């Protein structure tokens, strides 16, 4: 029986050595150590041994059982280690590879236009000035030659906060505030947000303007046209035609509407320009002497011009945008184009 036990031991350890998976090792445990296994079958023969041999063989059976159990446990541990190593190899991450970069946004078309306009005028000697969006009636209207009952106030529907405070309807109040703080000569542009009760495909209740002001000795209407011609040529192209049409603004005299040759048809006439060949882009004029009086300037000693443009309109013309509301809907499919 001792020979049978030793042979069983050798067979079991050979099977353990050949097993490569945990499942195979569990089958070996069942085959040799299970209730119907080989060791159990041999132990049934202990009763046939003499009283002297029985304890010796019994001790040998227990020793071999423990050895096989230890061998199986060692094999299971090794199998788990191999499985773990294989998983690590298959899921290995190369830490030297670059990571996934988050999607980068881009500047809004309104921001792009404001920056470009400011850069152009900076090259012409203009500095940027700012003012509050909640403005006093005096700065927004009266100082700009809009007296309380002036009919020109009907040109703009205004959001009033109370009797004297309002959401500014243009950035022209920045010109008043700047002239009250500084003496000529001065050249400023004032980009900012303005508010009016108007909303359709070409108007928004909140939009952006850039006002410009130049005051010095001997400034003429010709200087105004020259500055605006340089500006439009740099913004829309060197061959962009410019024309000025008589108009009216309470704070400038004389006043003009500034048109450029249609950027779509090149001045030949199309649906965008209503077959006129021209597109209106801004209003301008020589500063009215009454405005100088409000800020304490001597209208006999200095002269100057002012102009104002809607940034949304400039963006629509520059980028071929048909509906102003697209600029405020935050549609990523639209904004990704810029």
From Swiss-Prot:
Positions bound to Mg(2+): 253
| PROSITE patterns to which the protein is assigned, alphabetical | AA_TRNA_LIGASE_II
Top-rank lineage group of the source organism = Bacteria
Taken from the record, one Pfam family name reads: tRNA-synt_2d
Provide the E.C. number(s) assigned to this enzyme: 6.1.1.20
Show the GO MF annotations: ATP binding; magnesium ion binding; phenylalanine-tRNA ligase activity; tRNA binding
Which GO annotations describe the biological process of this protein?
A: phenylalanyl-tRNA aminoacylation
Task: Alphabetically list the UniProt keywords.
Answer: Aminoacyl-tRNA synthetase, ATP-binding, Cytoplasm, Ligase, Magnesium, Metal-binding, Nucleotide-binding, Protein biosynthesis
Q: What does the record note on quaternary structure?
A: Tetramer of two alpha and two beta subunits.
Name of this chain's protein: Phenylalanine--tRNA ligase alpha subunit
What organism, scientifically named, is this protein from? Answer: Pelobacter propionicus (strain DSM 2379 / NBRC 103807 / OttBd1)
């Amino acid at each position: 029986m001792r020979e049978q036990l030793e042979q069983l031991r050798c067979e079991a350890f050979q099977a353990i050595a050949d097993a490569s998976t945990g499942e195979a090792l569990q089958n070996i445990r069942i085959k040799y150590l299970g209730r119907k296994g080989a060791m159990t079958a041999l132990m049934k023969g202990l009763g046939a041994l003499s009283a002297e041999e029985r304890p010796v063989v019994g001790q040998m059976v227990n020793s071999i059982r423990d050895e096989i159990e230890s061998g199986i446990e060692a094999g299971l541990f090794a199998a788990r280690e191999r499985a773990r190593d294989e998983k690590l190899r298959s899921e290995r991450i190369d830490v030297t590879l670059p990571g996934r970069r988050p999607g980068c946004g881009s500047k809004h078309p309104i921001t792009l236009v404001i920056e470009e306009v400011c850069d152009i005028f900076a090259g012409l000697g203009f500095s940027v000035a700012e003012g509050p969006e909640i403005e006093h009636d005096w700065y927004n209207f009266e100082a700009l030659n809009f007296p309380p009952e002036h009919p020109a106030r009907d040109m703009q529907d205004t959001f009033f906060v109370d009797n004297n405070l309002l959401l500014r309807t243009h950035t022209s109040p920045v010109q008043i505030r700047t002239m009250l703080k500084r003496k000529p000569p001065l050249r400023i542009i004032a980009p900012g947000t303005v508010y009016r009760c108007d909303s359709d495909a070409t108007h928004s209740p909140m939009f952006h303007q850039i006002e410009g002001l130049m005051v010095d000795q001997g400034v003429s209407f010709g200087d105004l046209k020259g500055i605006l011609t340089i500006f439009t040529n740099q913004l829309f192209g060197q061959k962009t035609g410019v024309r000025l049409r008589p108009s009216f603004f309470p704070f400038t005299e004389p006043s003009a509407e500034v048109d450029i040759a249609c950027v779509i048809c090149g001045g030949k006439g199309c649906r965008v320009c209503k077959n006129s060949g021209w597109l209106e882009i801004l209003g301008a004029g020589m500063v009215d002497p009454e405005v100088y009086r409000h800020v304490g300037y001597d209208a006999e000693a200095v002269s100057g011009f002012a102009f104002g443009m809607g940034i949304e309109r400039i963006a629509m013309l520059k980028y071929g945008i048909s509906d102003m509301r697209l600029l405020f809907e935050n549609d990523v499919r639209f904004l990704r184009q810029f």
